[in-house]
Regions:
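Charged catalytic and DNA/RNA-contacting regions of genome-maintenance
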Residues: 1-335, 348-364, 368-460, 585-587
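Amphipathic alpha-helical transducer elements in NTP-driven molecular machines
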Residues: 4-8, 24, 31, 35, ...
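Short flexible coil/turn linkers enriched for glycine and charged/polar residues
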Residues: 17-19, 80-82, 123-125, 135-138, ...
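Extended, charged helical/alpha-beta scaffold domains that provide interaction surfaces
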Residues: 29, 456, 463-487
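ATPase nucleotide-binding head domains, primarily ABC-like/P-loop NTPase cores
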Residues: 35-38, 234, 304-305, 309, ...
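Charged, surface-exposed helical/loop "interaction arms" that form contiguous linear patches used
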Residues: 365, 382, 396, 400, ...
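Terminal-proximal interaction/regulatory segments of ATP-powered molecular machines
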Residues: 476, 843-849, 853-863
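Extended, charged coiled-coil "arm/hinge" scaffolds of SMC/Rad50-like chromosome-maintenance ATPases
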Residues: 503, 507-541
């Protein structure tokens, strides 16, 4: 193999340290990729694949492709979105000043969980990197969003530990997960990461989770001993947190000084929602299309700031269990709901607030440019007015927010004094610092501007001295400043001119005076560029030192934005304040589905009442036809409960919500082909999880249990599940149970606490009208054939279905009907059909005309 060039040797040495990354290797104005990286990148990014000499003898070529450094971000984003890791290798010194090969090193590794660039992130959601570590049946979970500085940790233990691990991962929806210890051995977790969470999963080496090292990392990062963090007796948590911190530091290279607070929480603080419940209730995206539109988040999120949008999603993912904390939010929402003028003023102010959290993260990590600083400065403008507005509000939560919210006027002024209003994108090319900010910079700029005046003076003097009227002074990068004289006038050039270049149209010369001026101007320009970067870096570092203030203000502004949004929604949609307590009761008057009523727009949504408690009204059996609205109603109840525990007003006339610890759903069915499970197996697995984990404080939404198997098997399973859920000694949870098994309605007479309800239907001849109203009692019919007709089944199929239904209801055997060539049903084939039997029983010979007409009318009714 040919001897490597110094640059290729340098590349391979760096690549060897990061074999799992695509290496973006900076060469001048480009990031280049070589060998296998180049082949992969050219395919993924549609780049032209070329070659470069690998060795000095030029006998061996290596594949190469590249992207301009100023547009690299978009290419990196595409690679990271597809799950690749990208290592950024920068030039660590100015190539013009380097002696020999330019020094290069990795400055950052970009992975799905470490993105901080605004163009690569969804501003409305956090971008979490998670870590799960397990030992002896106990698991520690940590979640960090380095784009905002948020850091959470929790634990899971006992028989339900893995279920809780998966539930928490579903709550945070991380972009990347690191797992180690017992967590790395869990097939269930591995399958969930791959199939249900669709996130990038990394296996952590055992040494990454070493107890002593991880404990020290956690204490150093958060500035507190483990006991003050509440982690002394939770080694699996600090080992998870420490491993995550170490991984992030290795990837970021610049440290995590903006990650200041570890928020440890326990399972009793928030409502539990498993992956099925989140999916079935369509909290953040719809089940079919995976879109925000049509989800609960779509209804709720009209926040004015990116920070508020992220906090609202967090509140949605973590509904509260404490009535005190819920009511504190509701008090604030109520005050703003009643104060429309104050609310509108807040909305107007919030529109001008920038994303402090993510700008601060870029500042601290050294990734912020001048435009980020200007955005931060401009975004601070509304803060004094926001403080004044909050000061006039009375709810206790506003007092807390006022204490947290800093007007940041000193930082705003510093940015405005230092940075021009419209700075360039690059921080290495000058043009950033405002005149008057630095005396030295102003002097250098005077030299450059004065030098331009001097050049004009020299040009005028030389024309006068030589008598050459077309003489001009110019500049190019090769020769610097020069005097150009046209060909016909070169005889007039004085001997003091030094010829540098011959052109077809003339000659170019230099003079000692011109070269001295050139050195002065170019030296000043270089110094200006370097000094501007120094001054910018000083401002950025000072802002980084103040990042704690900015982050506190960001959290306060985000909470204010969410509360204002909730109030505006309540006023706009006529929501009511729910009464929150620990009674276990669930009483809703004229409740509405928050999403459906907005999707319907002009159509009238029919409201419904709900009455559930832990006693005589524990279970509501809901019967009625498909398409009548059973599933919508049950989801509606669950969403109202969830919204109430977020601290939001709810779509109802009145609502009393006894706090619910978990919401379970079994709605819909689909095969899990990836794991080889049938519809019925998926259904039974989910039901088993519900019955295992539900408590008397839970809300169960069970739709069509048992429909995936035979009628009698399904009915038996549905009844057994219903009895188990209703039994106070086992669960006794508040339950909405929709079923087509009308035989189950008899349970109302057998088990205390079970009540029958149905969806009211009105028949108009052969047509049915769904009234969408929940009324007491069992349904008298499922109207399945009528629903099939409404769905558009062919008339012949519907007619045949009616015949078969009548035969089944009468207990007569059913046989296949032979079809004639003209598609008409053959009367001779209907040997046991009810219509045939009726015809055979008629004594036509003895009938009067009136009797014949009546008989014909009866026969027509049988069709």
């Amino acid at each position: 193999m040919a001897e490597l060039t110094p640059m290729m040797r340098q590349y391979l040495e760096i690549k060897e340290r990061h074999p799992d990354c695509i290496l973006f290797f900076r060469l001048g104005d480009f990031y280049e990729m070589f060998a296998d990286d180049a082949k992969l990148a050219s395919h993924e990014l549609d780049l032209t694949l070329t070659t470069r000499d690998r060795g000095k003898e030029k006998s061996e070529q290596v594949p190469m492709c590249g992207v301009p450094y100023h547009s690299a971000e978009s290419y990196i984003a595409r690679l990271v979105a597809r799950g690749y890791k990208v290592a950024i290798c920068e030039q660590m010194e100015d190539p013009a000043l380097a002696k020999g090969l330019v020094k290069r090193d990795i400055t950052r590794i970009v992975t799905p969980g470490t993105v901080i660039e605004s163009s690569m992130l969804d501003e409305s959601r956090n971008n979490y990197f998670a870590c799960v570590f397990g030992e002896d049946g106990r698991y520690g979970l940590s979640f960090c969003d380095i784009s905002t500085g948020a850091f959470y940790a929790t634990q899971a233990e006992g028989a339900e530990a893995m279920e809780r691990v998966i539930s928490e991962l579903g709550r945070f929806a991380p972009a990347e997960v690191l797992h180690g210890g017992d967590a790395a051995k869990s097939e269930e977790l591995t399958r969930t990461l791959q199939e249900r969470l669709s996130c990038c999963a990394d296996l952590g080496a055992d040494e990454l989770f070493a107890p002593q090292e991880t404990a020290q990392l956690v204490e150093k990062q958060f500035g507190k001993p483990l006991d003050e963090l509440g982690l002394t007796e939770r080694p699996e948590v600090w080992r998870s947190a420490g491993a995550l911190l170490r991984t992030l530091c290795e990837l970021q290279k610049t440290g995590l000084s903006h990650v200041r607070e570890l928020e440890f929480y326990v399972s009793g603080r928030f409502m539990e929602l498993d992956l099925s419940a989140r999916r079935n209730l369509e909290l953040t995206e719809t089940m079919r299309a995976g879109e925000k539109r049509g989800s609960l988040l779509w209804v709720l999120d009209h926040t004015k700031t990116a920070m508020g949008s992220r906090m609202l999603r967090s509140w949605l993912e973590k509904p509260l269990l404490s009535p005190k904390r819920i009511n504190a939010r509701l008090d604030a929402v109520e005050e703003l709901t009643k104060n429309s003028i104050g609310r509108d003023e807040l909305v107007h102010m919030l529109q001008d607030v920038s994303d402090y959290e993510r700008v601060t993260a870029r500042i601290v990590t050294g990734a912020a440019n001048c435009r980020d600083l200007v955005s931060l400065g401009n975004g601070c403008e509304p803060l004094p007015e926001l403080r004044a507005a909050i000061g006039g509000l009375h709810a206790s939560m506003f007092g807390v927010l006022l204490d947290e919210l800093d007007d940041l006027s000193d930082l705003r002024d510093e940015i405005r004094n230092a940075i021009v209003d419209e700075p360039p994108f690059s921080v290495r090319e000058g043009g950033m610092i405002r005149d008057g900010y630095s005396e030295e910079l102003d002097q250098l700029r005077d030299i450059v501007s004065g030098g331009k005046g001097t050049l004009a003076r020299i040009e005028a003097e030389e024309r006068e001295k030589t008598g050459i009227k077309t003489l001009r002074v110019g500049y190019n990068r090769v020769f610097g400043y020069y005097i150009e004289v046209s060909k016909g006038q070169t005889a007039q050039v004085p001997e003091t001119y030094i010829r540098k270049q011959t052109l077809t149209t003339g000659e170019r010369y230099i003079t000692p005076e011109l070269k001295e001026l050139e050195r002065t101007i170019l030296t000043a320009k270089d110094r200006i560029t370097a000094l501007e970067y120094e001054l910018f870096s000083q401002v950025r570092q000072h802002l980084a030192d103040q990042s704690a203030r900015i982050q506190r203000t960001a959290r306060a502004v985000a909470a204010l934005d969410v509360l204002t949004d909730f109030a505006a929604l309540a006023a706009r949609q006529n929501y009511c304040r729910p009464e929150i307590d620990l009674s276990g009761e669930l009483h809703i008057t004229d409740g509405r589905h928050p999403v459906v009523e907005q999707v319907l727009k002009d159509a009238l949504f029919v409201p419904n009442d709900t009455a559930l408690d832990c006693g005589a009204n524990r279970v509501a059996i809901l019967t009625g036809p498909n398409m009548a609205g059973k599933s919508t109603y049950m989801r509606q109840v669950a969403l109202i409960v969830l919204m109430a525990q977020m601290g939001c007003f709810v779509p109802a006339r009145t609502a009393r919500i006894g706090v619910v610890d978990r919401i379970f759903t079994r709605i819909g069915a689909s095969d899990d082909l990836a794991s080889g499970q049938s519809t019925f197996m998926v259904e039974m697995t989910e039901v088993a999880e519900i019955l295992k984990h539900a408590t008397s404080h839970s809300l169960l939404i069970l739709d069509e249990i048992g429909r995936g198997t035979s009628t009698f098997d399904g009915m038996a399973i549905a009844r057994a599940v219903l009895e188990y859920a209703a039994d106070k000694k086992r669960i006794g949870a508040k339950t909405l149970f929709a079923t087509h098994y009308h035989e189950l309605t008899d349970i109302e007479q057998e088990i205390e606490g079970v009540r029958n309800y149905n969806i009211a239907v009105r028949k108009r001849g052969a047509d049915i009208v769904f009234l969408r109203k929940i009324v007491p009692g069992a349904a008298d019919d499922s109207y399945g054939v009528e629903v099939a007709r409404l769905a558009g089944l062919p008339d012949k199929v519907v007619s045949r279905a009616r015949e078969l239904l009548r035969a089944l209801e009468s207990g007569a055997p059913v046989r296949t009907v032979r079809v004639a060539a003209d598609d008409q049903i053959s009367i001779t084939s209907m040997e046991n059909d009810a219509l045939r039997r009726k015809l055979e029983s008629l004594a036509i010979e003895t009938m009067t005309p009136i009797e014949a007409m009546n008989a014909l009318f009866e026969l027509k009714k049988m069709l």
